[in-house]
C-alpha cells in the first residue's frame, strides 16, 4: 500500500468477504441436503472454507492493525460502529425466534390440544441443567470483565488467566448443552415446541461457539503481546459479543425453559 497522509480506513482489496459468502451458501445448502438426503459432504466443505476464511481474514486484520498501524482512531471508531451494528442485527435475528415462540405459546392452536407445552411433550426441568448453564454463562461474563480490566491496567498475567477461564466456561456451557440435547425427551421434529426450542437454543449455542473462538483468538493475541492498555479493540469487540450472548441466554432461560415449561 502506498503511503497515506490521512487517518482513514483504506484497506487492500480482500478476497475473504467473497470466500466467506460462498462458505455461508455451501453451509446453508449443505444443512438442507443433510436434513433431506443424509449427506454431510457439502456442509463439511462449507465449514472447511469458513474456517480457512476466518483464519486468513483475522490474520490480515491483525497484520493491518497491529503491525502496519492502519488502525488509527478514526478507523477504530468505524470498527466500533460496525460491531455495534452487527450486534444490533443479531438482536433482531433472535427477536424472530422469540416472536415464533411467543406466537405459538401464548395462543396455542386446538391441534396442539389448546395448551402449552403441547399434549405429549415433556419439557426439560428449568432448575436442573439449564440453571447450571445460566450460572456458567453469568460467571463467564464476570471473568471476561475481569480480563478487560486486567488489559486496561496492563496486568498481562491476570488477563491471560481470566481469558482462559472465560473460554473454559464457554466450552463447559457447550458440553452441558450438547448433553442436554442428547438426553432431551423430544426432538426438533416434535411439532412447533421442538422446532422453536431447538432452533432458538441451537442458534444461541452456535453463538457461544463463535464467541469462544473469538475469545480464543484474543487469548493467543494477548500471549503474543498484541494488546496494549490503549489499543485492544479486538478484545473489546469479543467482550461485547460475549455479553450479548449472555443476555440472549437470560431471555431464553426465562422464556423457553422457565415460563414455557
Curated annotation (Swiss-Prot):
It is an enzyme of class 7 (translocase). The keyword Magnesium does not apply. This is Cytochrome c oxidase subunit 3. InterPro entries: Cyt_c/ubiquinol_Oxase_su3, Cyt_c_oxase_su3_dom, Cyt_c_oxidase-like_su3, Cyt_c_oxidase_su3-like_sf, Cyt_c_oxidase_su3_a-hlx. Component of the cytochrome c oxidase, the last enzyme in the mitochondrial electron transport chain which drives oxidative phosphorylation. The respiratory chain contains 3 multisubunit complexes succinate dehydrogenase (complex II, CII), ubiquinol-cytochrome c oxidoreductase (cytochrome b-c1 complex, complex III, CIII) and cytochrome c oxidase (complex IV, CIV), that cooperate to transfer electrons derived from NADH and succinate to molecular oxygen, creating an electrochemical gradient over the inner membrane that drives transmembrane transport and the ATP synthase. It comes from Carassius auratus (Goldfish). Residues 35-40, 106-128, 184-190, 257-261 are mitochondrial intermembrane. SUPFAM superfamilies: Cytochrome c oxidase subunit III-like. Residues 1-15, 67-72, 153-155, 224-232 are mitochondrial matrix. The lineage of its organism: Eukaryota, Metazoa, Chordata, Craniata, Vertebrata. Belongs to the cytochrome c oxidase subunit 3 family. It catalyses: 4 Fe(II)-[cytochrome c] + O2 + 8 H(+)(in) = 4 Fe(III)-[cytochrome c] + 2 H2O + 4 H(+)(out). One of its GO terms (molecular function) is cytochrome-c oxidase activity. Pfam families: COX3.
Amino acid at each position: 500500500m502506498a503511503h497515506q497522509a490521512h487517518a482513514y480506513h483504506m484497506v487492500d482489496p480482500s478476497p475473504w468477504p467473497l470466500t466467506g459468502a460462498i462458505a455461508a451458501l455451501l453451509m446453508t445448502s449443505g444443512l438442507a441436503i443433510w436434513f433431506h438426503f443424509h449427506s454431510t459432504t457439502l456442509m463439511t466443505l462449507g465449514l472447511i472454507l469458513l474456517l480457512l476464511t476466518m483464519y486468513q481474514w483475522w490474520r490480515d486484520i491483525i497484520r493491518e492493525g497491529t503491525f502496519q498501524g492502519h488502525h488509527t482512531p478514526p478507523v477504530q471508531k468505524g470498527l466500533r460502529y460496525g460491531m455495534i451494528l452487527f450486534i444490533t442485527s443479531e438482536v433482531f435475528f433472535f427477536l424472530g425466534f422469540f416472536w415464533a415462540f411467543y406466537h405459538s405459546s401464548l395462543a396455542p392452536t386446538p391441534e396442539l390440544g389448546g395448551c402449552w407445552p403441547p399434549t405429549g411433550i415433556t419439557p426439560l426441568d428449568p432448575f436442573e441443567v439449564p440453571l447450571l448453564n445460566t450460572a456458567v454463562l453469568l460467571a463467564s461474563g464476570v471473568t471476561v470483565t475481569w480480563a478487560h480490566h486486567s488489559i486496561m491496567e496492563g496486568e498481562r498475567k491476570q488477563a491471560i488467566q481470566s481469558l482462559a477461564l472465560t473460554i473454559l466456561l464457554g466450552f463447559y456451557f457447550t458440553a452441558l448443552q450438547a448433553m442436554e440435547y442428547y438426553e432431551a425427551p423430544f426432538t426438533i421434529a416434535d411439532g412447533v415446541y421442538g422446532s422453536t426450542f431447538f432452533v432458538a437454543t441451537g442458534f444461541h449455542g452456535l453463538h457461544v461457539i463463535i464467541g469462544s473462538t473469538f475469545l480464543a483468538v484474543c487469548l493467543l493475541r494477548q500471549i503474543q503481546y498484541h494488546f496494549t492498555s490503549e489499543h485492544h479493540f479486538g478484545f473489546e469487540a469479543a467482550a461485547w459479543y460475549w455479553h450479548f450472548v449472555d443476555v440472549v441466554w437470560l431471555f431464553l432461560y426465562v422464556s423457553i425453559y422457565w415460563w414455557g415449561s
